[in-house]
Amino acid sequence: MVMHVISPILLFFAENFSHVNLIIEQGNTSSKVAVYNKKHMEASFVYKKFDVDELESLFGKYDFEHGILSTVIGKNEVLNDYLRGKLRRFIFLDETVKLPITVQYETPETLGKDRLAAAVGANYLEPGKDLLVIDAGTAITYELIEASGAYLGGNISPGMTTRFKALNF
């Protein structure tokens, strides 16, 4: 199955809110943003650099009520404060957010939010199945989810660019 540009966990949250939602996923090399109105994606954007300036532009075009931010680059208080001040409901995805899966990873506070997002999203899209989720981005991650919804963990390896550089391509 080919995954969406925006991680499926964020779709889980988008589909469980009504009205217009702002969905932000900050990865290692880019930030992906989607605008959802109920269950329909109205727009999506990819940014190399994403900050409050980009948010102000988006808020000028859309009337957001809810939002979620998933990031692997660490908490940005300026960005978070801006979103908290503008949105009726804002979720910063971290290990304290109640999820529809059971995380059996030994140290959930060290688990990359991209990996957690992939596990929740896959389970949401394919409930009741044993799943191996592979995400090929800056890194390649492998996540194992049981049919019961238990996330067992996974593995992370260098992405394709790093692999080719290592082989002098």
Where are these regions (language model features)?
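Conserved phosphate-binding catalytic cores of ATP/NTP-utilizing and phosphoryl-transfer enzymes
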Residues: 11, 100-131
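Glycine-rich phosphate-binding loop plus the immediately following alpha-helix
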Residues: 113, 123-128, 152-169
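General beta-strand structural signal in soluble alpha/beta enzymes
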Residues: 91-95, 111-113, 132-135
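Gly/Thr-rich phosphate-binding beta-strand-loop-beta motif of the actin/hexokinase/Hsp70
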Residues: 19-37, 122, 128-147, 151, ...
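Short, charged, surface-exposed secondary-structure boundary motifs
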Residues: 54-56, 100-105, 163-168
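Methionine residue identity
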Residues: 1-3
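Conserved active-site and cofactor/substrate-binding residues in soluble primary-metabolism enzymes
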Residues: 50, 74, 110-117, 162
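N-terminal glycine/serine-rich phosphate-binding loop of ATP-dependent small-molecule kinases
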Residues: 5-99
